[in-house]
Amino acid sequence: MAIKRAAFNPAVRAETDLHDCALRLARVQDGHQRFGLFVRLSALQAGLRREHHLRLAAAVFDPILRRFEAQLFGLSNGDLMLITKDVPVLELDNLTAKLRGMFADDPMVYSTGQDGIGFATMFDIRRSPSDFLGLCETILADALARHQTIPSPAKKTSGRTDDSSRLTAQSLASICEGL
């Protein structure tokens, strides 16, 4: 799937940055182990998608971000994508377990969506960069569709202003009387 960027859309900045990163990683063959951990917070029940829940979920990644070479993308729909370099799989499994524990009240945490992606899905970028790039393209396309603005039809004006919207001495007097 090819994504064309017509114009910069700040509403999908994280998705655009993620897609750019995935494009670069698809070309890199340096022998480093790279993983992508996609956390689908947008599929949780509405009560668990509040702003403070999203902040707490992002904070779970802080130890990884401090100790390893990693980058966290907070997407516009609330989902998170962590891209890591040379992080042990056990560390990522521990993160996933913490996140599942935080949102254990939601049945989606332990199920898989129709697209085969569950609550937390790990991608081995080094072994299958095309799968990861495909996911990132889908994420970007969905975000662009979600934030697409439909221009309203232009108003036809004859150059005259509507008399009812003018402030006149009479309308001002009637306003003052009403007070």
Question: Model features per residue range: what roles?
Answer:
Residues M1-L179:
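Regulatory and interdomain segments flanking nucleotide-handling catalytic cores
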